[in-house]
């Protein structure tokens, strides 16, 4: 069975994000993944990434509205906005069906 495409994985990631499910979203990451939101320090490891999302979901209701998802080889690029107009983009490096690296940029309010 072929591995999931980076674009499809990010589509599923967005669905989990919009449900606010930190455990589910953590399952998309490799054990040693790095998530670097550029306004913050990089978060390393699936457990730490799960904790980051759990804290974020507990502190604010967040919704990711997809503008575009592009795929190039092992990479997927997500352009998004939220209901209040915040905009950003995320770069997801996917290997063997798991996110190994993610970098996010957004308009910091």
Name what the model sees in each region.
Residues 2, 36, 50-109:
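A beta-strand edge to alpha-helix "cap/lid" segment located at domain peripheries
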Residues 13, 37-40:
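Conserved short-loop catalytic and cofactor-binding motifs
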Residues 19, 23, 48, 100:
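Short, flexible micro-motifs
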Residues 4, 40-43:
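Charge-dense, low-complexity intrinsically disordered segments
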Residues 27, 42, 92:
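Residues that recognize and position ribonucleotide moieties
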Residues 42-51:
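Short beta-edge strand/loop motif at the mouth of beta-sheet-based domains
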Residues 1-23, 27, 31:
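Short, low-complexity N-terminal intrinsically disordered segments enriched in polar/charged residues
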